[in-house]
Amino acid sequence: MAENKYQYSYQYPHPAVTTDCVVFGYDVAPGDRESKKKNKRMALQVLLIERGGEPYKGSWALPGGFLRSEDYDGRPADENVEACALRELREETGVDVDSVEQFKVYSELNRDPRERVITVAHLALVKKCEVVGGDDAANAQWFDINDLPELAFDHQQILDDALEELRCRIHYKPIGFELMPEQFTMSQLKQLYDTILDNDAEHELDRRNFHRKMVTLGIVEPADASAERRERSRIMF
């Protein structure tokens, strides 16, 4: 009798569950890498993989994949969506991060041509690193967010939402540390914020107000007093 008590729970369809990762980095814009200019343009970049199989073979997409229900020996897999996101990111790009943050669930009926698939989207910020395609990804590459290829599935929508989420977080959460080197100037940090907010020259953040806010919040501190004396407009933090 007890075995049949919850039998009804298996009468409902079981959609597949996947994770997708939006991984942002910050580096010299591709067009300026070979330039001899002293002040090269920096760009917010996103990590994409080239799909090695159908559907959308050869198209670019966000790194991600299916939540495991079984391990390699056929036993039930103890994997939550965060572990799945970390595993897929590592397998498909070689990027190994400590954590990712969920920001939205996508469940539109026809978002995947194979079957009903619900994906849990995650966001990560990393210092720019070398990447390599692996597992079912034919390639992995960083792209300037303003110069993207056409993306598979609904991944453009996911990326747009992630960028909006990042722009919201920047107003209440310090994010520069994940994207900047260990030491940086206040000017470089301001440039990062202007880049994320897509501010042009007419709408960029006020330098003095930005400096005051960062110091008041206590999230940065001078790395070298001599550097401060040497050039106050470029204090190292």
PLM feature spans:
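C-terminal engagement modules used by replication, chromatin/transcription, nuclear envelope/ESCRT
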Residues: 228-237
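Acidic pyrophosphate-coordinating catalytic loop
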Residues: 106-118, 130
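The catalytic Nudix box helix
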Residues: 62, 67-101, 122, 189
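N-terminal strand-loop-strand
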Residues: 6-62, 82
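Core subunits and conserved enzymes of cellular information-processing
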Residues: 1, 32-34, 40-41, 49, ...
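A short, conserved structural fragment
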Residues: 216-228
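Short, positively charged loop/turn segments that connect secondary-structure elements
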Residues: 195-210, 225-229
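NUDIX/MutT-family hydrolases
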Residues: 123-124, 131-170, 179-192, 210-218
